[in-house]
């Protein structure tokens, strides 16, 4: 009897997507034998109602650009095309309907898993997918409250990179080369993303630094 398809689901704001996300998805794909990883940019993040978030189309397009070269990566619009706040339960339910024969593996930050009991329709989550928490080396998950066997942890050194840090660097006029894919550096510059209203200095994008 053949094994069911295994599909990874990586949800996130991706504002912007960076190498930490990509390395984490690639590592989990290899370790768990996933056929593909579907990146799902959040539509309206319910946890970030008081934060300024870039338009969904910009975040979607950056994710498409960043993942285009990996044949095992795909990008889904299920969250950004759904009206209202984005909840993981809705994301997984929609993907379950699209891939009824597959086992879903939801990839997220291990720190987020510590708050999972506060998530919308939490009782459904572990029925819809196995959860994989990606974390920095040495991180200890306080997971006594999580169902046994429902969560796996994977250490990813590149998780030290954060979207918040990338936005702060752009706002301060600092480069984000090598923190995000080259195409994302160019997209941010073209769209003028993450620049504060009082940022008169702009960002010195210039050519990509050489390896010499």
UniProtKB/Swiss-Prot annotation:
GO terms for molecular function: ATP binding; nicotinate-nucleotide adenylyltransferase activity. It catalyses: nicotinate beta-D-ribonucleotide + ATP + H(+) = deamido-NAD(+) + diphosphate. This is Probable nicotinate-nucleotide adenylyltransferase. Pathway: Cofactor biosynthesis; NAD(+) biosynthesis; deamido-NAD(+) from nicotinate D-ribonucleotide: step 1/1. It comes from Saccharopolyspora erythraea (strain ATCC 11635 / DSM 40517 / JCM 4748 / NBRC 13426 / NCIMB 8594 / NRRL 2338). The keyword Iron does not apply. Catalyzes the reversible adenylation of nicotinate mononucleotide (NaMN) to nicotinic acid adenine dinucleotide (NaAD). Belongs to the NadD family. Keywords: ATP-binding, NAD, Nucleotide-binding, Nucleotidyltransferase, Pyridine nucleotide biosynthesis, Transferase. The keyword Signal does not apply. It comes from the Bacteria. The lineage of its organism: Bacteria, Bacillati, Actinomycetota, Actinomycetes, Pseudonocardiales. Its EC number is 2.7.7.18. One of its GO terms (biological process) is NAD biosynthetic process.
